[in-house]
């Protein structure tokens, strides 16, 4: 036993419970050059009996060890050849030339993909372009001109496998189908933000859109016209909309690595005006079913402790009002739930209807320095009229547990599982996490 | 039958390979004249992945370890005598504080002489290309070679101070370290060797010119007198063989017969690392040197690079949680999930001293029973209480005067910084002593 008195801090109170055999008996404090003590033979990492009981697992692990050895050699080469700095340099050079390469999909359900953004040098950022694509053959191209607060843009979208199960909250899972959407959009957008204590955002836009519904391209489900024959008349018909919209928001959210305090209120109104035949920019056929879309969204967060444990309440309501009640919007313009849009346990596009109501309650807490966990529940439903026909017994619920890798500044992505009435679904994203 | 033969042969070969790889019972070591072992290198990336992810899983699947755990019979260090002390001589560690009287002056002299480069011009041989901080390899007017390392721009004195202080403490604790000293110079003191090289941003090695030098110095903090501050680390004698691992043995060193994770000096290092918050204690921050002394050539094992020690994280200050969890800490994750995050982390009560030259280190939230490096260290994973008490005995032997003198090696311009670091080290030492040496229940003879 070692007895340490309170004086140890003042004197060299070396506890000397046992004499120590100092082979190099000189008073020299320098390291010895003598032959070091060693046992007569090499000591095993494991005792023989440990090796014996571990033998089966050792055998099984041999391929993994081989893989590890290969990885080690490869990673050592990366280090010795300075390949990481070289890659960083290459990315920095391409960034200086205005090209930024990124990884990520085009919204939920479009599959893993990548994007290239291009801002030509010497344009002061007034000219921007991007191309994105995914392994499921989704594509999106964007060209923008103008300062950030006033942007003229052209967008081309190809979404070949959009899920559709029918209209309404009772749409059957067995009616799975898909459609493709080809859309082009040109417009002018004004975006202003002001205020520090009460940050305010205002956006207004006008433009024209041409959209064409096509038969779905998914190989694992029938196309929409096979399951819902009434939709066949809307396929392959280019339709033009004149669009105008306004969005205002108040945003007091703050916090790192995720926003943990404050609230955000957002209201948006859009008008999709009917165009009969050709538009100002795009060619179309027939007259499009015009409609107005109103949405209201609110978020509020409250956190406690230093590494924030955060409670969040998020609500969103969307109300679509067709100009002609007998001509509802096309499938791609309906409100929808499932996947990243809400009710994550359901496939993206699982529910379609005019309106939707979604409420999400989430709790986010830290796991380790570079990871946090979100447990949440979504409650919501689509309906024909969110104010009058939404019934509590029609609300769907899903529950989620999401791991969110994070830096000290922000969440970096998410991976997790959501489950609900129709089973569980693994969800993953790179970026795009608040 | 013929079809099965290759399979049987393969299994036999695998069995042989397994036994050979793990050091079979019949393995004997041929006595041999020590030849210069080959130079090795550790991949930082592989080391990180291996010890963060792969090895913790393998440890959980280690049935032998589990049997030992359940039976309360952990494997003790393999190089201790009947009195539970390190068998000497050792090329890893020398008994100093805790085992022999070491005066403050002896500690300050350390591996010696502790004065940095000789006055006069410094000739730059090449720029440092590894690690996270910039630096130069130089020779002083006496022809002695040094590595000069610098502080991050916004945190003057932090990394250099930590390196100087910690090297002093680790030497006094018995470990082999380089002779480190804070050293200041002007740009005019530096000259480029005609053979000086630098690895540029493209990752290519090329001749170094004055522009490269001035570009690197642009980011080096200067003192009020305009001089650049550096940590001058005297290059170690001998031929560098690369870092050692905290696990396994160096196969081509006939004097390395004990798996490193079963060495008392490396297991017990945990206590000193905990005291000094050296969360960066890992293979890549070590160095084996092929040394010839007294007509004998052998491998000597050094701890190097203390720039990520105490409150410094080399390029930034330490996070408050440093030392409380691994980068990927399954135990902490499990606890957090089990309590849905409602149990506060100890570090959440930490108060930042707001001393840029110190970074962040505190004693209030320091838990001497559960300190952890940045990612698992194999030797620390195998430590038993006997190993920790061995290390704690060394920590206990540092007097306040030793600590104050070691901190003075950091040459902090702000006296509050030196006072703070001294106080924190004293309080952390006291906590270690109380936890590991004062409690009779702990010091009872149990693993």
Model regions: which residues?
Chain A
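C-terminal outer-membrane beta-barrel translocator/porin domains of Gram-negative envelope proteins
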Residues: 44, 48, 72, 76-80, ...
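Transmembrane beta-strands of outer-membrane beta-barrel pores
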Residues: 103-109, 120, 131-137, 147-162, ...
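Outer-membrane beta-barrel initiation region
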Residues: 12-154, 158-163, 201-203, 234-260, ...
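Surface-exposed coil loops of outer-membrane beta-barrel proteins
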Residues: 153-187, 198-203, 209-242, 333-354
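Outer-membrane beta-barrel proteins
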Residues: 132-138, 175-181, 274-290
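Outer-membrane beta-barrel "beta-signal"
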Residues: 246, 401-412, 422-434
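Bacterial N-terminal signal peptides
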Residues: 1-5
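Boundary at the C-terminal end of the N-terminal hydrophobic targeting segment
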Residues: 7-11
